[in-house]
């Protein structure tokens, strides 16, 4: 596997409203663990759409990993131009920082938002251009990742395409592990 698409929930879907929320660190640890196994097996590119939440936290994880694995690259393919246009200023600044550090940035539709069809095109693009999908996603709480996860599963039924998930139970395990380590 050379290219993996990473996605997951938006912050508000997780009850997270600031990047210094303890849950963010937990999610980043889970992403790091999964991505590390893929990097050790030859992963070269992580692709995201630049969505707030899991995707931008994954970008931070990639930047941290690039210190030890300089061949690991991050590409941000936005579904449309200026997706950050209506975001709060601190979210825009954070997003722009991620874009400035990414190895490749492009827009899939090359135009500003016009319709939900652009999100569908984004999902198709990500599934076509990647070898696998990694999602912070739990089927019991579908949320925004639902559609790309469904597309990935459909592709997996007819081709050698894998979907990997970080479940809420995985995050709970990390929290318990941290509590155990801090108690010692």
Swiss-Prot record:
InterPro entries the UniProt entry points to: YspA (IPR010697)
Recorded superkingdom: Bacteria
Pfam families, A to Z: YpsA
UniProt family annotation: Belongs to the UPF0398 family.
HAMAP family membership: UPF0398
Protein name: UPF0398 protein BCB4264_A1614
Organism: Bacillus cereus (strain B4264)
């Amino acid at each position: 596997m050379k290219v993996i698409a990473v996605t997951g929930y938006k912050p508000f879907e997780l009850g997270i409203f600031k990047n210094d929320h303890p849950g963010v660190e937990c999610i980043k640890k889970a992403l790091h663990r999964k991505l590390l196994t893929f990097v050790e097996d030859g992963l070269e590119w992580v692709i995201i759409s630049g969505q707030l939440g899991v995707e931008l936290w994954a970008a931070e994880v990639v930047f941290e990993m690039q210190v030890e694995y300089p061949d690991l690259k991050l590409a941000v393919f936005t579904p449309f131009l200026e997706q950050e246009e209506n975001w709060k200023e601190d979210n825009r600044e954070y997003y722009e920082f991620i874009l400035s550090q990414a190895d490749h940035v492009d827009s899939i539709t090359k135009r500003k938002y016009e319709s939900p069809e652009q999100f569908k095109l984004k999902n198709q693009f990500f599934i076509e251009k990647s070898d696998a999908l990694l999602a912070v996603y739990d089927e019991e709480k579908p949320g925004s990742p639902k559609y790309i996860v469904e597309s990935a599963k459909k592709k997996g039924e007819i081709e050698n395409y894998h979907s990997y998930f970080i479940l809420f139970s995985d995050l709970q395990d990390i929290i318990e592990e941290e509590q155990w380590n801090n108690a010692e």
